[in-house]
């Protein structure tokens, strides 16, 4: 929201931005990112705007403990206060953005990292036949694959485009694809991950026949990444 103010002959405006801020700290060793700290909370940032220049004049955060909820309800507009209280609503997307920036900063070889995460997941339980059992046994590795976001999608697309992903790796990649891109999930039964992806890829091409890339980027971001790879 914007609030006009006057200071002598200079026209100014105060703009208040309501949002959810995340800060994460990483260390980097042996080619891998390690999360070592961070914070995640609602914030209100106030900018003073004059002559197209934005200056931060206030950075508000709620107090801890029993004041937390009441501070948010007092500060945030009624129509968005519930979103401010639900810290999980945007958390995965925000963590993915933090990971993306850390990857770029440290120049992480994401293909090698993601390959190792899948290798660890496939290692046990060796007697299981249900892919979900492997995910349950390696929830931390699977969560890490989720956090790598677009890099995991790039890996998945490359592997499926190579073909013959008919084993456990293909099934795990299919599940991860659906979790990373729920907006593009297919309602069909497929014997293998490769069979599922082949239909998924056909669907992406059909979407391209109906919409331009700008629309796809906004509404089907995973398909947008895939279509860029095959153009």
Model-found features: residue ranges?
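Extended, hydrophobic interaction surfaces within ordered domains
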Residues: 47, 78-80, 177
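Extended repeat-based scaffolds of very large eukaryotic assembly and lipid-transport proteins
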Residues: 109-231
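Hydrophobic transmembrane alpha-helix bundles
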Residues: 30, 92-104, 195-197, 207-214
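Low-complexity, intrinsically disordered terminal/linker segments enriched in charged
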Residues: 57-109
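Short glycine-rich, low-complexity/disordered patches
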Residues: 1-2, 85
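Mature extracytoplasmic domains of secretory-pathway proteins
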Residues: 2-65, 137-167
